[in-house]
Amino acid sequence: MLFRKVSVIRGRVLTPSGQGLRGVRVSNGLALREGFTLTRSDGHFDILVTGGGPVKLKFGKSPFPYQSRNLFVPQNQVMNIFLYKFK
């Protein structure tokens, strides 16, 4: 990861009823070497990614199926994404 391109994506994962979902694994499916994060007890997460290009956020927690969301992330930015509901 080039430090001059580092960006942060912040977001929140919710259950279908609107509650924050703890322990969801969030990763960049296009750059698995960048690691992953887990959502906190209120469903919020922060993940460090290489900015300046596409990111495929992958969300996973049993018993829910894995889901993904494609984003373009500018470099050197903190990006807040919309609430994400597990189905």
Where would I find each of the regions flagged by the language model?
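Intrinsic-disorder/low-complexity, polar/charged segments enriched in Ser/Thr/Lys/Arg/Asp/Glu/Gln
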Residues: 6-10, 42-44, 78
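Short, acidic Ser/Thr/Gly-rich low-complexity loop/linker segments typical of extracellular
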Residues: 22-23, 28-50
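Beta-strand-rich domain onsets/edges
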Residues: 1-22
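A short, solvent-exposed loop/turn motif at the edges and junctions
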Residues: 29, 50-86
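Surface-exposed coil/turn segments at beta-strand junctions on protein surfaces, enriched
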Residues: 2-4, 38-40, 48-52, 72-74
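Pro/Ala/Gly-rich low-complexity, hydrophilic intrinsically disordered segments
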Residues: 1-5, 82-87
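Residue-level detector of beta-strand face positions
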Residues: 12, 25-27, 58
